[in-house]
A protein has these predicted regions:
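Boundary at the C-terminal end of the N-terminal hydrophobic targeting segment
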Residues: 19-21
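Short N-terminal segments immediately surrounding and downstream of signal-peptide cleavage
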Residues: 23-49
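Acidic/histidine-rich, surface-exposed loop or edge segments in extracytoplasmic proteins
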Residues: 30-40, 96-108
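Short, contiguous alpha-helical
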Residues: 45-56, 66-105, 144-189
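Acidic/histidine-rich alpha-helical segments that form the ligand environment
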Residues: 58, 110-145, 151-166
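Surface-exposed helix-capping loop/turn segments at secondary-structure junctions
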Residues: 61-67, 130-139, 177-183
Length: 189
């Protein structure tokens, strides 16, 4: 785990320096990892943060002037896909019954600075909710989105969101490569 953490931090540092000139000055930083875990909350939180670092990294890799890029006219733009991750994360996290207030995500915020800020807000919201629930509450069954059946554990819904984010991440990688950009995760030795 320590090797993965170190490698992730080095990759983030290297990719950040390569795209610093492209990143808006007000863009939020990617979250740090908690470290080795001994309980469910820590594991879920580490996975959530790792997932958000990947999404944030791929969003940051695309230059601001390319955020409107669409592989085909029928597809969403890069910025719309990034914003989609933030929107779905906040929407489904709101259904988990947390006391932590949800951040407002502007559905029309598709500039690089706005989309990255939305991803950061959604990630921070997830961090707060996971910490709020803790081990016992993460395993409680709640009403779930229709496509997951009538009831699911909070943990399952959070992992669904990570899976969905990774699916969208894969799409965003194609957008980057179509623009001649190597995704941050592919820059690792």
């Amino acid at each position: 785990m320590l090797h993965i953490k170190t490698l992730a931090m080095l990759t983030m540092a290297a990719s950040g320096s390569l795209v610093y000139a492209q990143q808006p000055p007000a863009a939020p930083a990617a979250p740090a990892f908690m470290g080795p875990c001994s309980n469910l909350t820590c594991e879920v939180l580490n996975d959530w943060m790792r997932n958000n670092v990947m999404v944030y990294g791929v969003a940051n890799a695309m230059p601001a002037e390319k955020y409107a890029f669409k592989p085909t006219p029928e597809q969403q733009s890069f910025g719309e896909r990034v914003l989609h991750v933030a929107q779905i994360n906040v929407t489904l996290l709101q259904g988990l019954g947390a006391k932590t207030p949800a951040p407002a995500i502007d559905p029309k915020a598709v500039s690089k600075a706005e989309a990255m800020a939305a991803v950061q807000k959604a990630g921070d919201y997830g961090n707060a909710i996971i910490k709020e629930f803790g081990d016992q509450q993460l395993t409680v069954r709640v009403s779930s989105p229709w496509f997951m059946g009538p009831m699911s554990t909070r943990q399952r819904i959070i992992y669904f969101l990570m899976m969905h984010s990774q699916d969208t991440y894969g799409q965003l990688v194609v957008y980057l490569r179509l623009n001649g950009i190597t995704p941050p995760a592919s820059r690792q030795p």
